[in-house]
Amino acid sequence: MKCSLRVWFLSVAFLLVFIMSLLFTYSHHSMATLPYLDSGALDGTHRVKLVPGYAGLQRLSKERLSGKSCACRRCMGDAGASDWFDSHFDGNISPVWTRENMDLPPDVQRWWMMLQPQFKSHNTNEVLEKLFQIVPGENPYRFRDPHQCRRCAVVGNSGNLRGSGYGQDVDGHNFIMRMNQAPTVGFEQDVGSRTTHHFMYPESAKNLPANVSFVLVPFKALDLLWIASALSTGQIRFTYAPVKSFLRVDKEKVQIYNPAFFKYIHDRWTEHHGRYPSTGMLVLFFALHVCDEVNVYGFGADSRGNWHHYWENNRYAGEFRKTGVHDADFEVHIIDMLAKASKIEVYGGN
């Protein structure tokens, strides 16, 4: 009996010691390792501090899911808006001929050399090597900022610009692209006064202000020799027609249109309608590949169905449709398709 009582007392004592030990350990652990239970840790600062990080992750996730490559409402190169456009568009082809893409594929070389055949052949690469000692030979559009929206106006030469009043709207774009003669003085209210890019070939070339990029559209190796000459010695004065022996343009802003891009338009877009695409189409697709948003002015006939230039008084000149080189009707069809695909907006003029 005495032994049983002794065992019972010892058991109770050990149990009480064990319980007290647990209580002490829990209390000490709570104070030492759970600071978020401290009243100071429950203020609004800590709760608010967590929210922006999570919200930021949500915004980043939405941006990634949207897949947009620019800050415009719609971005030109982003797929999904039109199956027709996506099946034709190739964003990997540079519209600018540079040191990096100087070597043309054989099929492109043959096609380009036959656009305006010359009696005397020239080594294209050697000509380009010399030319790129005078002009940059770089692609200024290689890097695009996804946080910006590059808006471009492609301004054609149609008579439908007369009386349109588009001038201020045109001048509001980042890039304003014109072609060939395209006078602005005296027509500012309708065509605008600013120009950032002017596309010409030797036979249509004119002097440009220092802040304008001259984009040469070459149809033959002689055109490359001409621009090198026009910016240096002035020796070349004739191709198949008289050309300017000297040209006043900013050498640092001279760009050369890529024949491979030229053929890409002919193959993919105009689908061999006409011998080759018109200058207007070349400029339009240049814009489609370097811009985020493209608005088109001065293309097609006027409201009476006449084809003429906006600076011509003869409304019935219709030179564009009489050349036999370009298929005007098919090019109008392509422009209409691009507009329906929401890739461009066309301003029909007067």
From Swiss-Prot:
UniProt PTM comment: The soluble form derives from the membrane form by proteolytic processing.
Question: Where are the glycosylation sites?
Answer: 211
A single Pfam family, by name?
Glyco_transf_29
Enzyme Commission number: 2.4.3.4, 2.4.3.2
Under catalytic activity, the entry for this protein gives: a beta-D-galactosyl-(1->3)-N-acetyl-alpha-D-galactosaminyl derivative + CMP-N-acetyl-beta-neuraminate = an N-acetyl-alpha-neuraminyl-(2->3)-beta-D-galactosyl-(1->3)-N-acetyl-alpha-D-galactosaminyl derivative + CMP + H(+); a ganglioside GM1 + CMP-N-acetyl-beta-neuraminate = a ganglioside GD1a + CMP + H(+); a ganglioside GM1 (d18:1(4E)) + CMP-N-acetyl-beta-neuraminate = a ganglioside GD1a (d18:1(4E)) + CMP + H(+); ganglioside GM1 (d18:1(4E)/18:0) + CMP-N-acetyl-beta-neuraminate = ganglioside GD1a (18:1(4E)/18:0) + CMP + H(+)
Q: Which GO terms describe its cellular component?
A: extracellular region; Golgi cisterna membrane; Golgi membrane; membrane
On assembly, the entry states: Homodimer; disulfide-linked. Homodimer formation occurs in the endoplasmic reticulum.
Functional note:
A beta-galactoside alpha2-3 sialyltransferase primarily involved in terminal sialylation of ganglio and globo series glycolipids. Catalyzes the transfer of sialic acid (N-acetyl-neuraminic acid; Neu5Ac) from the nucleotide sugar donor CMP-Neu5Ac onto acceptor Galbeta-(1->3)-GalNAc-terminated glycoconjugates through an alpha2-3 linkage. Sialylates GM1/GM1a, GA1/asialo-GM1 and GD1b gangliosides to form GD1a, GM1b and GT1b, respectively.
What protein name applies here?
Answer: CMP-N-acetylneuraminate-beta-galactosamide-alpha-2,3-sialyltransferase 2
Native source organism of the sequence: Pan troglodytes
